[in-house]
Swiss-Prot record:
Organism of provenance: Roseiflexus sp. (strain RS-1)
Keyword tags: Aminoacyl-tRNA synthetase, ATP-binding, Cytoplasm, Ligase, Magnesium, Metal-binding, Nucleotide-binding, Protein biosynthesis
Protein name: Phenylalanine--tRNA ligase alpha subunit
Cross-referenced HAMAP family: Phe_tRNA_synth_alpha1 (MF_00281)
Catalytic reactions on record: tRNA(Phe) + L-phenylalanine + ATP = L-phenylalanyl-tRNA(Phe) + AMP + diphosphate + H(+)
Residues reported to bind Mg(2+): 262
Gene: pheS
Cofactor note: Binds 2 magnesium ions per tetramer.
Family: Belongs to the class-II aminoacyl-tRNA synthetase family. Phe-tRNA synthetase alpha subunit type 1 subfamily.
Domain of life: Bacteria
GO cellular component, one term: cytoplasm
Gene3D superfamilies named among the record's database cross-references: Bira Bifunctional Protein, Domain 2 (3.30.930.10)
Taxonomic path: Bacteria, Bacillati, Chloroflexota, Chloroflexia, Chloroflexales
Length: 347
């Protein structure tokens, strides 16, 4: 068989084999077997040197034509197989709309936000409305209108962040409590009765410990009207504690001092860990403080636009983080501001 006959036979076999190729891996093997450096076409071309000189041009042209034919066939087959592979990939990625959907990941509210909403719900059912007041406050509203004139010793109860202001401008500070909101709520409602809660962030220049943070939330509450007495304050706080910590929770009131209330009290609940026996959490007292309260001082009522001779009122202030700590047994307030997912995902 002449070299050209062998070439014709090789071309026929190669094209026939190409028609049987079903994937790109087999196509690569076909290319190596027929068109590679050690492939069948290259091995056959080595016989060109043994031909008579007059036959070499014809045989060389035939070799070039055969190579071109096989390469063109290879390109067509490769393009077709790639289209098929893309189609298979597309079909594999298609979503079966008849299958049940995947539920999206559900986020969680921060435990402070959860406690705030619980407080809103309980006090809202008692007729209290939510008010907001500025976080950057004047010295007048943060101290003076709350019965703490300049140089009053009660100011030492709070370590204050002051804001730089131009000479002659009012002294500005980051509010140390939400009590300034009392004045805003009073002046907006006087001389009419009012029940309001004033939640928000407070700031104090304190060392950060397991019990203290420089930034924290507080909820202030006031109720003003005719013939409001300490009994109303007591009934409100006891009902609030029972809603938050469970029916039958033991409570007590202790005398205290706040410049904007008179008389002033601390409101405690029985320690839920030791049942009143005394433990590390309650400092062996058997009780846990949850808020401060009292009857609004006549000076504060007057500064809010009310006549203390005709109306009276009570006020209370609580820390949502502290109340959440008591409710969930959290021993370090710094967790609330850590952003640690291990902590937040528990709520």
């Amino acid at each position: 068989m002449s070299l050209i006959d062998q070439l014709n036979q090789l071309e026929y076999e190669a094209l026939a084999a190409l028609e049987q190729i079903a994937d790109l891996t087999a196509l690569a093997e076909w290319k190596s077997a027929y068109l590679g450096k050690q492939g069948a076409l290259s091995r056959l071309s080595r016989g060109l040197g043994a031909l008579p000189a007059e036959e070499r041009p014809v045989a060389g042209a035939r070799f070039n034509a055969a190579r071109a034919t096989l390469e063109q066939a290879l390109e067509r087959a490769e393009a077709q197989l790639k289209r098929i592979a893309r189609q298979h990939a597309f079909e594999a990625d298609q979503v079966d709309v008849t299958l049940p959907g995947r539920a999206p990941a559900v986020g969680r509210l921060h435990p402070t936000t959860q406690m705030l909403r619980t407080i809103y719900g309980i006090l809202g059912e008692m007729g209290f409305q939510v008010w907001e007041s500025p976080e950057v406050e004047t010295d007048e509203f943060n101290f003076q209108l709350l019965n703490m004139p300049p140089d009053h010793p009660a100011r030492d109860m709070w370590d204050t962040f002051y804001v730089e202001t131009a000479p002659g401008e009012p002294t500005l500070l980051l509010r140390t409590h939400t009590s300034p909101g009392q004045i805003y709520a009073m002046r907006a409602n006087a001389p009419n009765p009012v029940r309001a809660i004033l939640p928000g962030k407070c700031y104090r220049y304190e060392q950060v410990t397991a019990r203290h943070e420089m930034q924290f939330y507080q909820v202030e509450g006031i109720a003003i009207g005719e013939q409001i007495s300490f009994s109303d304050l007591k009934g409100t706080l006891v009902a609030f504690a029972e809603r938050l910590y469970g029916k039958g929770v033991k409570t007590r009131f202790r005398p205290s001092y706040f410049p904007f209330t008179e008389p002033s009290v601390e409101f405690d609940i029985e320690c839920f860990l030791c049942g009143g026996a005394g433990c590390r959490v309650c400092k062996q007292s058997g009780w846990l403080e949850i808020l401060g309260a009292g009857m609004i001082h006549p000076v504060v009522l007057r500064n809010g636009g009310y006549d203390p001779d005709t109306v009276s009122g009570f006020a209370f202030g609580m820390g949502p983080e502290r109340m959440a700590m008591l409710r969930y047994g959290i021993d370090d307030i710094r967790w609330f501001f850590s952003g640690d997912e291990r902590f937040l995902q528990q709520f």
